[in-house]
Amino acid sequence: MPITTAASRLGTSAFSNAAPIELRSNTNKAEIAQVIAAIYRQVLGNDYVLQSERLKGLESLLTNGNITVQEFVRQLAKSNLYKSKFFSNNFHSRVTELNFKHLLGRAPYDESEIIYHLDLYQTKGYEADIDSYIDSAEYQTNFADNIVPYYRGFNNQLGQKTVGFTRIFQLYRGYATSDRSQIPGASARLANELARNSASTVIAPAGSNNGFAYRASVKGKTPSTAFQGSQAFGSGRLYRVEVAAISQPAIQVRRINKRSIHRRTIQLFPTSSTSQWQIASVTPL
């Protein structure tokens, strides 16, 4: 894995040396149970599954060798369990982001992928959209019939785009988090970024960096752009600086982000190097 040296800082150390989980022909029942647990964890975004929610019939078919891991993943993604967790209560752009993450192990590369799957869903329905991921050449090349899907966005692989590395960190927020427990809720994480065809800065998941994980403010009082300088600041380039309250070891109930515009970034550092605030981003305007 190319990020091994920074794995602990980025919250990916759990995947640094982990080999793909595969269902082999000579696997015993205990190993099959581990495969099933890995499928639930990946496809359901690490969300907790009650004993009563488990798909016992599907598990039995896999245990008896009647279906492959690929077919288990397909049926799980089409199940009412998956729909209730990720389809019914989310915007469709968020649904597509999660389908890419859960089924292909990566983030969407560009807006055309979102548009394609939205059109497929509207014209042929939900199940056809799920089939398009599972039956794709990308899925077959990486997971074949019996490898449990895993996060490929942390690796450099043939055919992958570099932008996928930064975007996967918008979707993956730590090994112990689930896709239904994140602060932004049901809103899409990559909609604005894909529309601008831009790449975001890698934001380490919560739990790393002593608990500090910066998330950009959805709304702010300071402007996001400036045109042809500003008379209030005089000539020269402006910078939008956003600072955030540093998380302490104790539980934080509320986080506060503040934005301000500076003509020179050096003006900010003497006043912001206190124990209460940490510079989260510096953006040229």
Swiss-Prot record:
| One Pfam entry name | PBS_linker_poly
Please give the chief subcellular localization of this protein. membrane
Q: Where in the cell is it found?
A: Cellular thylakoid membrane
Domain of life (superkingdom): Bacteria
A Gene Ontology BP annotation from the UniProt entry: photosynthesis
Bilayer topology term: Peripheral membrane protein
Every copy of the PBS-linker domain together lies at 1-180
Q: Which GO terms describe its cellular component?
A: phycobilisome; plasma membrane-derived thylakoid membrane
Quick check: keyword Membrane in the entry? Answer: yes
Which controlled-vocabulary keywords does the entry list? Answer: Antenna complex, Membrane, Photosynthesis, Phycobilisome, Thylakoid
Q: Which family does it belong to?
A: Belongs to the phycobilisome linker protein family.
Give the protein's function: Rod linker protein, associated with phycocyanin. Linker polypeptides determine the state of aggregation and the location of the disk-shaped phycobiliprotein units within the phycobilisome and modulate their spectroscopic properties in order to mediate a directed and optimal energy transfer.
* Designated name of the protein: Phycobilisome 31.6 kDa linker polypeptide, phycocyanin-associated, rod
Q: What is the lineage of its organism?
A: Bacteria, Bacillati, Cyanobacteriota, Cyanophyceae, Nostocales
Report the gene name. Answer: cpcI3
